[in-house]
């Protein structure tokens, strides 16, 4: 593994509950842009990151694996002085945040996966593998993936914009390498049985990372797991149903017992 990198990031809010948000395979941190205006920035402080090969880290060298991504997330938490924090990961980012939990379980308050890739990986049939593997150099493949995983219901303009963003804000070589890691690696034995509260949010229109798949993986591995399925939503809840996503995720994060301690600490007088 290469040396850790302090991931490019932006901070939103100044609340006591710290949260690190990790994007998925087809986007950089701008994937979270649709939800940013309506977050509770008094209760939470969000660090939204770019993984290696994406966004401001597009040219960063590395192995482009979920384990490396987790080490980079922990390095950022150290730089920010965040001893404990919650995690949000979308799709591939869901695998990365589960890797963080495996590496440093004592530091994770709550775990959220938005259409998360399971810690067991996501084996793909040959035709699907060809589609995904070819997406690094073929934008049309990315469009097919976007369209399929949102139930074929999204407008052409949105699909085109998402493809442009994906191509512009990712390095093709890194993009292809990330696929081998998130799809092919199985580390679920390292997180199975973790008592950390873990929420999986899925879209009813997503045929790939469905509620059924999460029941067979996420819900079995985490004793304190919750599953929410958003209707009329596919794989990209930040774009498709941003307000519903915010409500579900922030309600889950607020349920942390440590929030009471945070509030008391914030209001304590010297």
What spans do the regions from the language model cover?
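Conserved acidic catalytic loop of the alpha/beta-hydrolase fold
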Residues: 68-84
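Catalytic active-site module of serine/aspartate enzymes centered on a nucleophile-bearing elbow/loop
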Residues: 224-270
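Conserved alpha/beta-hydrolase catalytic His-Asp/Glu region
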Residues: 122-123, 138-193
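Conserved loop-alpha-helix segment in the C-terminal half of the alpha/beta-hydrolase fold
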Residues: 199-233
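Gly/Ala-rich beta-loop-alpha elbow adjacent to hydrolase catalytic centers
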Residues: 89, 93, 97
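Flexible "cap/lid" loop of the alpha/beta hydrolase fold
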Residues: 98, 102-103, 108-138
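Conserved HGGG/HGGXW glycine-rich cap/lid loop of the alpha/beta-hydrolase fold
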Residues: 8-59
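Short beta-strand immediately N-terminal to the catalytic nucleophile in serine-hydrolase-like folds
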Residues: 87-89, 114
